[in-house]
Amino acid sequence: MAPPVPAPSSDLPNIAPRDKAEILAQALPYIRKFHGKTLVIKYGGNAMTDPALQQDFAEDIVLLKLVGMNPVVVHGGGPQIDEALSRLGKKGTFIQGMRVTDEETMEVVEWVLGGEVQQDIVGLINAVGGKAVGLTGRDGGMIRARKLKMVDKDDPSIEHDVGQVGEITAIDPAVVKALQDDQFIPVVSPIGFGEHNESYNINADMVASKLATVLQAEKLMLLTNTPGVLDKAGKLLTNLSAREIDELFADGTISGGMLPKIAGALDAAKSGVNAVHIIDGRVPHAMLLEILSDQAYGTMIRSH
């Protein structure tokens, strides 16, 4: 196994040329291993709002494409939606990690995610030499959905109405594959459509997980604002099985926005995605180090 690649820091420009060459050489086995493979990355959290991390992310995505991998980006945008709602005098409400989405909120979600946020990401990637194309689940009939029936996690007899929040019924990845074949980088907004052409706000982690499954991705990486999954004492859990995850659900260790993230990650692992990682998006280049070295950042989810 190759020695770990040093974590990037502000001292990187001062590394001797020979050491820089060694770092690049250590990445070669991983470049060979993942050449031609699809990697689905859920982009969210601080990595989307910190300018330096935004730049790092865009450069990392372009590098992965240039060395022969096929990155697919699925993005969130919770803080941006909250800001837009605040300007309209509305406050976001969440139930079990899902945003309650009435008709007005759905309109905001569509123009924030499918417009402002998506175009910012596409622009960043293209500015550093990539060829990114923005999509929503409507494009190419990619993401079909229906209204999510949310049962209370403590009392199954209670069902919560979360408005136009959707659950995925089918994903047609044809448009994503066509873009990949032409060397584009797909950037997907988590908006689906129903049988009557109604729009649905879908959790971005769930979209990333389902898309990774249908694309038979080699890796699914979910960027977060935490080091990974933490136990009740705040200690990082670096490796979790399905059984351990069930226990963490039951005792309340996993809650809030982490609920759909872990559920989606586990579903992808059970459905054949080779490696599923929850990664600290606040660490510069953590995604790149996870792929191109034996450094471990965050939590790995296993189906067994």
Swiss-Prot record:
One Pfam entry name: AA_kinase
Gene: argB
Protein name: Acetylglutamate kinase
Enzyme nomenclature, EC number: 2.7.2.8
PANTHER family (UniProt xref): N-ACETYLGLUTAMATE SYNTHASE, N-ACETYLGLUTAMATE SYNTHASE, MITOCHONDRIAL
An annotated Gene Ontology molecular function: ATP binding
Cellular component aspect of the GO annotation: cytoplasm
Pathway(s): Amino-acid biosynthesis; L-arginine biosynthesis; N(2)-acetyl-L-ornithine from L-glutamate: step 2/4
Substrates-to-products reaction catalysed: N-acetyl-L-glutamate + ATP = N-acetyl-L-glutamyl 5-phosphate + ADP
Annotated keywords: Amino-acid biosynthesis, Arginine biosynthesis, ATP-binding, Cytoplasm, Kinase, Nucleotide-binding, Transferase
Site (Transition state stabilizer) residue list: K42, K261
Family the UniProt entry places it in: Belongs to the acetylglutamate kinase family. ArgB subfamily.
GO-annotated biological processes: arginine biosynthetic process via ornithine; L-arginine biosynthetic process
Subcellular localization(s) per the UniProt record: Cytoplasm
Functional summary from the UniProt entry: Catalyzes the ATP-dependent phosphorylation of N-acetyl-L-glutamate.
Ligand binding (substrate): G77, G78, R99, N201
Top EC class, one word: transferase
